[in-house]
Design a protein with these regions (language model features):
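Short, conserved glycine- and acidic-residue-centered signature motifs
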Residues: 2, 13, 41
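Helix-turn-helix/homeodomain-like alpha-helical modules used for DNA recognition
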Residues: 57-75
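DNA major-groove recognition helix of helix-turn-helix/homeodomain DNA-binding modules
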Residues: 25, 42-60
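Append "Primarily bacterial transcriptional regulators
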Residues: 20-21, 69
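Residues in the helix-turn-helix
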Residues: 19, 30, 44
Length: 75
């Protein structure tokens, strides 16, 4: 997950930085650092990504059209 994907997912869910940080059990500074492109520990990234995926976000890998996020199909 890239920082821009985190921000897009967070905004799509209507969450602020505080909400995501609380759910992922990380500091707001950690979310801010990720969203501006800083490197985080893999375990921290996994924690944040897991929370977003559990909320229904699917991460789109770079496939020629660029990276992104979308809501997972509930089926």
């Amino acid at each position: 997950m890239k920082g821009i994907q985190c921000k897009l997912a967070r905004v799509a869910l209507g969450w602020g930085v505080i909400e995501l940080a609380s759910r992922a059990k990380v500091s707001t500074q950690t979310i801010t650092r990720l969203e501006r492109g800083d490197q985080l520990r893999p375990s921290t990234l996994e924690s944040i990504q897991s929370v977003l995926e559990e909320a229904g976000i699917e991460f789109i890998k770079e496939n020629g059209g660029g990276i992104g996020v979308r809501f997972r199909d509930p089926d």
